[in-house]
Amino acid sequence: MKVSLFITCLSDVFFPQVGKSVVEIMNQCGVELDFPEGQTCCGQPAYNSGYQEDAKLAAKQMIKAFEHSEYIVTPSGSCASMVHHYYKEMFKGDSEWYEKAVHLADRTYELTDFLVNVLGKNDWKSKLVEKAVFHQSCHMSRALGIKEEPLKLLSQVEGLDIKELPYCQDCCGFGGTFAVKMSSISETMVDEKIKHIEATEANLLIGADMGCLMNIGGRLRRKNKNIQVLHVAEVLAKGLNK
């Protein structure tokens, strides 16, 4: 099986360790992984801001970059949902690119979805002794319907005590450009999220979207809270070396 890694902007620039963790996970699974260098931003910021033509240019570049990939895996539900849902919306009325967009979407998987539903991983051998909570990101849970997959994998990590996070599916306030355009509302939302995290007395927050982790993690640091923030890929990969 050959898999191409769609790294995403946030992992490339801010969370390179997440990309490295995905590579370690795929190696553990015996998957042949490549990295198409022509990949770029999925176009979501431009699309959400109303710059349709710019978003189309990004989408076309992505389609070209992964044209020959058997499977495409990304550690981001947000970017995966962009490819799955909005590429097809953008190219309605353009039969050539619409078909290419559908073909790309059919081969693109969020990481935990791929591990559970394609590779059938139900015996993940890793160990990490922490008390943790898991944050459900909006795009991943609502747009893609991926809710149980990350929890199923995390339940297999020896020593990891997952506490239930109240209102776990409530938005953290990131929302891409929303956090910039409506920063005061975003700040209120993330403070509410942190209140619920603290109520669990967990010392580790796990998520599957780096936008959420950047937003919550940044706010935790500004408030001097001693709560670590990790992507689910980092948790699964860390345990491999224990």
Swiss-Prot record:
What's a single GO BP term from this record? lactate metabolic process
What would be one Gene Ontology cellular-component term for the protein? cytosol
Q: Which GO terms describe its molecular function?
A: oxidoreductase activity
UniProt record similarity statement: Belongs to the LutA/YkgE family.
Q: Which PANTHER family match?
A: LACTATE UTILIZATION PROTEIN A, UNCHARACTERIZED PROTEIN YKGE
HAMAP family, alphabetically? LutA
Summarize the protein's role.
Is involved in L-lactate degradation and allows cells to grow with lactate as the sole carbon source.
The name on file for this protein is: Lactate utilization protein A 2
Q: Which gene encodes it?
A: lutA2
